[in-house]
Amino acid sequence: MTMGNFLKRFGSGKSRSSRNMTLGTTSSQSHEPSPSDPSLSLADNTNATKKKYALIPDRFSSLDQVSKALREAGLESSNLILGVDFTKSNEWTGKTSFDGKCLHALGETSNPYEKAIFVIGQTLAPFDEDNLIPCFGFGDSTTHDEEVFGFHSDNSPCHGFEEVLACYKRIAPNLRLSGPTSYGPLIDAAVDIVEKNNGQFHVLVIVADGQVTRGTDMAEGELSQQEKTTIDAIVNASSYALSIVLVGVGDGPWEDMRKFDDKIPKREFDNFQFVNFTEIMTRNSPESAKETAFALAALMEIPFQYQAAIELRLLGKQTGLAKTIVPRPPPIPYTPPTNAELPSTASPASPEQTQSCPICLTNRKDVAFSCGHMTCGDCGSKISNCPICRVRITNRLKLYT
C-alpha cells in the first residue's frame, strides 16, 4: 500500500466528533465527566486529563495501528503548518550528511530540506483536506530569533506541497542565513493560525538543522534566552489544539532536542515531539520503507494529542489571548551589479564586510577563539563549536579596539 493510499483511508471530511476512543492501553470509555456524577468536578476531571497526557509514550509499531487509533479518535483530517530553518548553522551541518555543502544549497541533487519537504508531502499531506499549507521561514538576517517571514508576500498559504517546494526554491537563493535559533516566533505564528481558525486541530511541522541556541558556559539547568522563548511558546501552545513535530535534518547534534521534553515545565498536554529525518532516511532500506518509518515516527503521538485536545476541550476553543503575528514578506532577491557597474579590477572586501560577525552578519567581530576565527561577543557566547572550522571552542578572547 502506498503512503498516499494509506493516509487517504482517514477520509476527507473534517469530523470533529468526540466519540468513545481506544488508544493503546487507554480505556475505551469516554473520559468526559458525566453530568450525573457529582463526585467528579470539571476541575478534577481536567486535572486528571492533564496528568494523563503530561508525557505521551510511543505505543505504536506499525502504521496500521496509528491508522486505527486515528479513526477511533475521530481524526479524519487535519491542517498542516510548515516552518523552515534558515539559520547560519545550515552552512556547516551538512559536513557529513550532505558532502560538506550548505543544507540549503540548490542543484541537480535535492538538498535535505527539499527531501524532507517532499517526504512530508508524500506522507502527511493527505491529512490536509483543503491542501492549503501556511509556510514560514525563520532565522535569516531579516527575522533572526524574533520574527518569521511568509512564503508569499500576501501571507497566503501554499496550495499543496508542489507549490511549497517551488516557493522554497525561489526563496532560498535570496536569503542571508543568520540566527540565533529559536522556535518561539514560529510556534506563536502557528498558535495565531489555530486561534483564527476557531480552534481547529493543526499540526505544525518544523524542519530544522539544529538545536535551540545555547551557550557552552551555561550551567546545568540554566536556560538561554532562546530556550526560554521556545519553551514558553510550547507551554502556551498546549492550551490550543496544536501538535508540534520537529523534523531534524543535517548532522545535528540532536542530543539536547531528544531531551527537550525534560526541560519543559507543566503543560496542558505533551504537544511536542522530535523526529531525526537524517537517521531514518540514511538507513539501508528501500525508499518506501524509509518513508513509512518517517511517517510512523511523525504520526506516533498524534492520536493521543488529538484525544487530549478533545478531553481538555481545546477543539473549537478561542482564548482571545493568542498573539497576533504579522509575518514579514519573503526576502527580496539579490540583484548583482551589471558589468558596467563592476570595477575593472577586483576590489578587496570593505572593512565593514570583513569585520562583520559570520553568524549574525550585523555586529562587529570582537571575540577570537583558539582556532583563530572570530565572531561577535553575543553570538560567540552561544556556540560550542567554531562556525567556520567546527573545532570545539575551548577559549574565548575578548578584543578591544
UniProtKB/Swiss-Prot annotation:
A zinc finger (RING-type) spans 357-390. The keyword Zinc-finger applies. It is an enzyme of class 2 (transferase). Widely expressed. Residues 1-43, 326-350 are annotated as: Disordered. Its EC number is 2.3.2.27. Induction: Repressed by the mycotoxin fumonisin B1. One of its GO terms (biological process) is defense response to bacterium. One of its GO terms (molecular function) is ubiquitin-protein transferase activity. It comes from the Eukaryota. InterPro entries: Copine_C, E3_ligase/Copine_domain, VWF_A, vWFA_dom_sf, Znf_RING, Znf_RING/FYVE/PHD. Its main location: cytoplasm. It catalyses: S-ubiquitinyl-[E2 ubiquitin-conjugating enzyme]-L-cysteine + [acceptor protein]-L-lysine = [E2 ubiquitin-conjugating enzyme]-L-cysteine + N(6)-ubiquitinyl-[acceptor protein]-L-lysine. Disruption phenotype: No visible phenotype under normal growth conditions. The double mutant plants rglg3 and rglg4 show decreased sensitivity to jasmonate. It is found in: Cytoplasm; Nucleus. Interacts with UBC30, GRXS17 and GLB3. This is E3 ubiquitin-protein ligase RGLG4.
